[in-house]
């Protein structure tokens, strides 16, 4: 990892991100979204991007919503030893996003901020086979991709609201996620579904997304 030329005690998260992506993209399953022969990992087509677009673009890659949740989680985690042990600082951390996963997203569903459309709810319930009574969808289903995208937007808005109440006390996005939305999502899920503590929407995944 190279430090910035202007300050040898500062690392650039954008450079670190490039390193992680170059290392990890090749290991993701090849049945995922592919552009120019390259599997993209945790990035999925989203029909909303196409229907809301004002451009008549035939390039389907334009309508892909990237998440890379596991890689971002890893990146957040790996910044900690550089800071705490080596006393180095990171720049461009604001380029990182929230983590679009089922605890953060489940919080907004359980609290009534987001809800499935009736047709999607019915389709999800028909796909459920575990007796949970919860709607289930594949990780690449448009419902899940849109839910995760909305999770990013809502956590960003929540982060700004929380910062306004911090009275100048520094709070990173990673701290909000770990001690705030993720923990709250788990606690609310435990209260609403004590037997399973599962998300209100079940994601059918092979473990390479969540």
Q: Across the structure, where does each feature detected by a protein language model lie?
A:
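Extended, well-ordered protein cores
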Residues: 1-85, 91-120, 135-210
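C-terminal structural cap/anchor segments
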Residues: 124-128
